[in-house]
A protein has these predicted regions:
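N-terminal secretory signal peptides that target proteins for export/translocation
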Residues: 1-22
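Glycine- and acidic-residue-enriched helix-capping/strand-helix junction motifs
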Residues: 62-76
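Short, solvent-exposed, polar/charged sequence segments at loop or secondary-structure edges
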Residues: 86-129
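Bacterial Sec-dependent signal peptides at the C-terminal "C-region" and cleavage site
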Residues: 37-45
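Bacterial N-terminal signal peptides
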Residues: 25-37
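C-terminal/domain-edge helix-coil "capping" segments
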Residues: 44-59, 79, 87-88, 116-121, ...
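Secreted/luminal cysteine- and crosslink-motif detector
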Residues: 13, 27, 112-115
Length: 191
């Protein structure tokens, strides 16, 4: 029937004009498109993700030396971090193979910014490094650092304590840092 309101039709049958509901729906749709366009990154930042390093200050480390299970975990942490950053779409990973041997031979946390110089040499805008600090088999800490490759400035530093020297504790801690710090919206943004 003409003039009857149909929930799925928002054009007035008499005048053929938009009703106030239709205007509201259109303006909301346009607003959402605008907001998404404004907050969408202009490009994925290029990043060099270096392998995690172990800082072992435990008595066990002094007595027994390097543990193969911890070395394997460090490699897996690095792979998982790279994969998650790539999958996020916010970062474009740069191949660090040309500088990998030099990075492995350095203490990236104590080399006076060599990580940013290495990142710059492979064309990255950012350098990401990470450490696992082991106090004992019970008390460990994971850190991730994001630095600007051109200036060397630290853009973000994130840290989380973990309990237990197991695969599960290491990977859950990395997952938490990625979700709640590294890829969290507006983490570290000063307003």
């Amino acid at each position: 029937m003409i003039g009857e309101r149909n929930a799925s039709v928002y054009i007035c049958p008499m005048s053929g004009r938009f009703t106030s509901r239709m205007r509201l729906a259109c303006s909301l749709a346009v607003s959402w498109v605008f907001l998404l366009a404004v907050h969408a990154p202009t490009h994925a930042q290029t990043v060099a993700v270096f392998d995690f390093e172990l800082i072992d200050t435990s008595v066990e480390g002094e007595i027994r030396g390097v543990r193969s299970d911890e070395q394997a975990r460090l490699g897996q942490l690095s792979l998982q971090l790279r994969e998650r950053l790539k999958d996020s779409g916010r970062f474009s990973l740069v191949d660090i193979a040309p500088v990998a041997a030099e990075a492995r031979a350095s203490n990236l946390q104590g080399c006076g910014g060599c990580d940013t110089r290495l990142a710059g040499r492979v064309g990255a805008e950012l350098s990401i490094t990470g450490t696992v600090q082991k106090v004992s088999n019970l008390i460990l800490n994971m850190n991730i650092y994001v630095r600007d490759a051109s200036s060397g400035a630290t853009l973000a530093a994130m840290s989380a304590d973990m309990r237990g020297n197991t695969d599960e504790s290491w990977f859950r801690t990395l997952d938490w840092l990625i979700r709640n710090r590294l890829l969290a919206p507006d983490y570290g943004v000063r307003r």
